[in-house]
C-alpha cells in the first residue's frame, strides 16, 4: 500500500513539476526576448526572470529528490547524491524566497505613496540598486547554505555508517535529531524574508487605504490607475504569503519525518506540497503583469487557431 501511495504522489509531483516549468519558463522566455529586442531590461523584468530561473532550478531539484527517494533510497541515503541534492535544494529555496521578497519590496516602493524622506529617497533609487540587492541575496544564500548543509549531511552520514549494533538505534536517533534541527534552522532563516514581505504587505494596505480616503474626499472615485496598481500588487504579495506558509509547512512535515516510521512517504508528501508554491505562484504573477498577461493571451489564441485549423482540415479529409 505504501509503494502505491508513493507512486501516486510521484506522478502527481511530475504533474505539478510540468505545470511549474511551463509557467516559469514562459516568464523567463518572454522577458529574455523583450530584453534582446530592446537591448535593456526593466527592473521588474529582471526580478521576475531571476525568480523564474531560481524556481525552475528548485522544481528540478525537488523532483529529482522525489525520484531518488522512490527509486534509489539506499543510494540516496549513503552516497554523496544526498549531499549535492540537499545543498542545491536549500540554495534554490533561499534564492526563490529572497527574489520573491525583492519583488514585494519593489512593488512597495514603486506603488505605495508615503512622504517620509527616507521612503522617497529609496523610491527614487530602487531601480538603480535592485540588481545589487539580487546579487546580495545570492551571496547571502551561498554563505548561509554551505556550512549548514555540510553539518546537516555529516550528521546524517554518521547515522547511516554506524555499525555498532548495540548503539545503532540510539546513534541514528541522535544524529537524525541533529539533522532535523539543522534543517529547522535553515527554515527559520527564511522567516526573515517572509517578515520583510509581511511588512511590505501591511504598508501597501495602509497606502491603499490612505489613497482611497483621498479619492473619496476629492470625489474623484476609487478606481483610478493608482488604486488598480495597489490591488494588483496586493494580490501578488498576499498570494506569495499564503503559498509560502503552505511551503513552510511542507518543510516541517519533511523535517518531522525522521521521527515517524514511514519516513520516505512523509518526505514525498511534504515535497508534493512544496511543489505547489513555485508552480502556482508563477501563473499568479503572469496574470498580474500586463506584458506577461498579453503574451499569454496571444499564445493561447495562437494555439486555439492551430487546433481549429487542424479540426477543419480533418473534416475536409
UniProtKB/Swiss-Prot annotation:
InterPro entries: GPCR_Rhodpsn_7TM (IPR017452), TAS2R (IPR007960). Glycans are attached at residue 167. It is a multi-pass membrane protein. It comes from the Eukaryota. This is Taste receptor type 2 member 7. Disulfide bonds: none annotated. Belongs to the G-protein coupled receptor T2R family. Residues 31-55, 116-128, 209-235, 288-317 are cytoplasmic. Pfam families: TAS2R (PF05296). Residues 1-9, 77-94, 150-187, 257-266 are extracellular. Gustducin-coupled receptor implicated in the perception of bitter compounds in the oral cavity and the gastrointestinal tract. Signals through PLCB2 and the calcium-regulated cation channel TRPM5. The chain crosses the membrane at residues 10-30, 56-76, 95-115, 129-149, 188-208, 236-256, 267-287. It is found in: Membrane. GO terms for cellular component: plasma membrane. Several bitter taste receptors are expressed in a single taste receptor cell. GO terms for molecular function: bitter taste receptor activity; G protein-coupled receptor activity. Keywords: G-protein coupled receptor, Glycoprotein, Membrane, Receptor, Sensory transduction, Taste, Transducer, Transmembrane, Transmembrane helix. The keyword Transmembrane helix applies.
Amino acid at each position: 500500500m505504501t509503494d502505491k501511495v508513493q507512486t501516486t504522489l510521484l506522478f502527481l509531483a511530475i504533474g505539478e513539476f510540468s505545470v511549474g516549468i511551463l509557467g516559469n519558463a514562459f516568464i523567463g522566455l518572454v522577458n529574455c526576448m523583450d530584453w534582446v529586442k530592446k537591448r535593456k531590461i526593466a527592473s521588474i523584468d529582471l526580478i521576475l526572470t531571476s525568480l523564474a530561473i531560481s524556481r525552475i532550478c528548485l522544481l528540478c531539484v525537488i523532483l529529482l529528490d522525489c525520484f531518488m527517494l522512490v527509486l534509489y533510497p539506499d543510494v540516496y541515503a549513503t552516497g554523496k547524491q544526498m549531499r549535492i541534492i540537499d545543498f542545491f535544494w536549500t540554495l534554490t529555496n533561499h534564492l526563490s524566497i529572497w527574489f520573491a521578497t525583492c519583488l514585494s519590496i519593489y512593488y512597495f516602493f514603486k506603488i505605495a505613496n508615503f512622504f517620509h524622506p527616507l521612503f522617497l529617497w529609496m523610491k527614487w533609487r530602487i531601480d538603480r540598486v535592485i540588481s545589487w540587492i539580487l546579487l546580495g541575496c545570492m551571496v547571502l544564500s551561498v554563505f548561509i547554505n554551505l556550512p549548514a548543509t555540510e553539518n546537516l549531511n555529516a550528521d546524517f552520514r554518521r547515522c547511516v555508517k554506524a555499525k555498532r549494533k548495540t548503539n545503532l538505534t540510539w546513534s541514528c536517533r541522535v544524529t537524525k535529531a541533529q539533522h532535523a534541527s539543522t534543517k529547522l534552522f535553515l527554515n527559520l532563516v527564511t522567516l526573515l524574508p517572509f517578515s520583510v514581505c509581511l511588512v511590505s504587505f501591511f504598508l501597501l494596505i495602509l497606502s491603499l487605504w490612505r489613497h482611497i480616503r483621498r479619492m473619496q474626499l476629492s470625489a474623484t472615485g476609487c478606481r483610478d490607475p493608482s488604486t488598480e496598481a495597489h490591488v494588483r500588487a496586493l494580490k501578488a504579495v498576499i498570494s506569495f504569503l499564503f503559498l509560502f506558509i503552505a511551503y513552510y509547512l511542507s518543510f516541517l512535515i519533511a523535517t518531522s519525518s525522521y521521527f515517524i516510521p514511514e519516513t520516505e512517504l512523509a518526505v514525498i508528501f511534504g515535497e508534493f506540497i512544496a511543489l505547489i508554491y513555485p508552480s502556482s505562484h508563477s501563473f499568479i504573477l503572469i496574470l498580474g503583469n500586463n506584458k506577461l498577461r498579453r503574451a499569454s493571451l496571444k499564445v493561447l489564441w495562437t494555439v486555439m487557431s492551430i487546433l481549429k485549423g487542424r479540426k477543419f482540415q480533418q473534416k475536409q479529409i
